[in-house]
Amino acid sequence: MIYVTFTPYGAFGVKDNKEVSGLEDIEYKKLFNEEEIPDIMFKLKTQPNKIADELKEEWGDEIKLETLSTEPFNIGEFLRNNLFKVGKELGYFNNYDEFRKKMHYWSTELTKKVIKSYAQQKDKIIIQVAEAISDLDKTLNLLSERLREWYSLYFPELDHLVNKHEVYANLITKLGKRKNFTKSQLKKILPSKLAGKIAEAAKNSMGGELEDYDLDVIVKFAEEINHLYEKRKELYNYLEKLMNEEAPNITKLAGVSLGARLIGLAGGLEKLAKMPASTIQVLGAEKALFAHLRMGVEPPKHGIIYNHPLIQGSPHWQRGKIARALACKLAIAARADYVGDYIADELLEKLNKRVEEIRRKYPKPPKKKKKEKPKAKKKEKKGKKEKSKKKKDKKKDKKGKKERKVIGKTKSRK
């Protein structure tokens, strides 16, 4: 077996990890072209096994790479201690200043490539898009509330009749004035029954009259809110496409929004794939988990996976068990997505079977256990001798206080 250590300018190997005292003791060498060194270093960082296979074919023997998880090789220790000396002998450096400059350049180029590859990862884009949608939702809620309060000065009854912010903004954009809220116009946008109620409310509205230019400002504000709703739909469609490409198993089990939020909370698909099911189950419930660890309160049964329909639509005593089953399947789905396998249909079938089993097994809530009150500690009865001693001590203290003399200023003799 060949024990191999990499340096920025080449790969070096010896058989059976033998001692190395000089360049002549190194049996296998593969020197790199200076222009290709940053690319080779990046490849070594991201695909070390591929490079090991290439060396195996070239050198014709089994390869063992020195990594952070292995014990240091003898050849590795020699090269690290003599990096400049060996490089100079091989013709890479003429002096120490040149060595420092080249090492700095190679390290900088490697860092740039790592950052570039990190930014190109699709799961990082998924996280940003999901966060953008979340920010838009908060903004839309805030602006819609402002629109409702503002337009209620003119048509207050509409606020109670239309619950959805998007529909409310759409009505103001298309109709504007109260006189335009006729049944025929409203039926183009809303169901007939609701259209009739709004038309009747518009006729008998208690709202005040506004000037045309005041009303135009409100209508333009509503138009901007509508544009934001359209942008949100575009982002959601884009997120759905990304999730189906990068995490089809998670998307099938958890849905687009919940799956993207899980990837975001984990910090990426790779990190989510490395998480155990117990951690995935409580993602998003960190505060409750820390409260359990610090103060001993009940641990959380679920985090953001509570938003899954299987958990939300179940009775409270079944939710913890269903959350555990869902988290187990999501952990498998994340690993399958990371390696590029599609097993979502099989996972979904097993999950549904497990949920049905839980619902059959626990149809009724468990009986509540009565909490036993902690017994108060009985005060130990003090003996008569101890009581008499305390009384004597108190009497002595009182006598001592009376006997004490107060020392003040003495009067001067005349």
From Swiss-Prot:
One Pfam short name? Nop
Recorded GO cellular component terms are:
box C/D methylation guide snoRNP complex
Q: What residue stretches are annotated with the Nop domain?
A: 246-360
GO molecular-function terms, A-Z:
snoRNA binding
The organism's place on the tree of life at top rank: Archaea
Ranges for region Disordered: 358-414
SMART domains (UniProt xref): NOSIC
Q: Where is the composition biased (Basic residues)?
A: 361-414
Tell me which family the UniProt entry assigns to this protein.
Belongs to the NOP5/NOP56 family.
| PANTHER family in the record | NUCLEOLAR PROTEIN 5 NUCLEOLAR PROTEIN NOP5 NOP58, NUCLEOLAR PROTEIN 56
- The protein, known as: Uncharacterized NOP5 family protein MJ0694
What phylogenetic lineage does the species belong to? Archaea, Methanobacteriati, Methanobacteriota, Methanomada group, Methanococci
